[in-house]
Amino acid sequence: MKKLSKVFSAFVKKPLTSETLESALNELNLLLIGNDVATETADALCEKIKESLKGEQIGRLTSKSKFLFEILRDIITEILTPERTIDLLEEIRIKNKSNNPYIICFLGVNGTGKTTTIAKIAYYLKKNNISSVAAASDTFRAAAIEQLSYHMQNIGIRVIKHEYKSDPASVAYDAVQHAKAKNINVVLVDTAGRQVSNKNLMREMQKIVRVSEPDLILFVGDSLAGNDALNQAKEFNNSVGIDAHILTKFDADAKGGAALSISYETKKPILFVGIGQGYDDLEPFDNAIFISNILDLKEE
């Protein structure tokens, strides 16, 4: 996120006047887009800055950097604020009061680290004394069941699985029934990585959702994929519906634009970010920390 921080820092320290604001915002817009901020998000951010400065005599401000910093902080806070906030642990506890498991369905394209992320979530739940079972509903990709089983065995979580090419929805259904019978708190449903253009796999995904009736649908995206991650999230949201995001490889993302764009354009919260390969390398996404990282500005 250092690159995005430098972009905002340079903007704040510019010798802005009412006459030069437009060109400065155009330059900011291009720099944002160059750092994985989607065009629509960059346009909205710059327009909000312009609106916030309307009527201000910028050149006469005695503390211009501080003033612009506060404007940016408020605007980015607004961009990152979702339509619905999710307290995962609390939602699980509420659902469990009715003696029913809380069901989480994970989706995304291949190569984003989805299966490893499921293991990280299982480990996170285990640390919070919440039991879980995994459904190996990726019956499409070779070695997918073995990969999930390997990770879950490492952390002591059972996997419900069928044969390859079997109905993925039936695997999810069996996992839910197992959780009910064994009084397990959470069902974690793995699904085949798919492109939204693959209509057969998308119909399969819709069936999994219809049969398992998840309480939470999580899109797992690669933060290094930039606008591709945003486009994938939007397409999955249109086809299936998603409730929140997990961004992987967040520790390696020098730009930080994907988080801004996904938050703004889907209006869905980022619940967690992956920060390494270990099962414990998962952190709840904190808006305030993210903002402080990309607005690491010091007044001149």
Question: Where is each model-derived feature located?
Answer:
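Short acidic DE-rich linear segments
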Residues: 1-6, 300
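Short hydrophobic/aromatic residue motifs in ordered secondary structure
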Residues: 39-41, 141, 251, 279
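Conserved catalytic-core segment of NTP-binding enzymes
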Residues: 147, 167-182, 196-299
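Short hydrophobic/aromatic patches at helix-to-coil boundaries
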Residues: 190, 299-300
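Short, cationic motifs built from Arg/Lys/His that form the positively charged side of catalytic pockets
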Residues: 141, 154, 191-194, 210, ...
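Primarily NTPase-proximal linker/entry elements flanking Walker-type ATP/GTP-binding cores
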Residues: 4-137, 144-164, 173-179, 186-189
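Short glycine-/small-residue-rich Rossmann-like dinucleotide-binding loops
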Residues: 110, 192-193, 222
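Charged, low-complexity surface patches
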Residues: 21, 114, 140-141, 168, ...
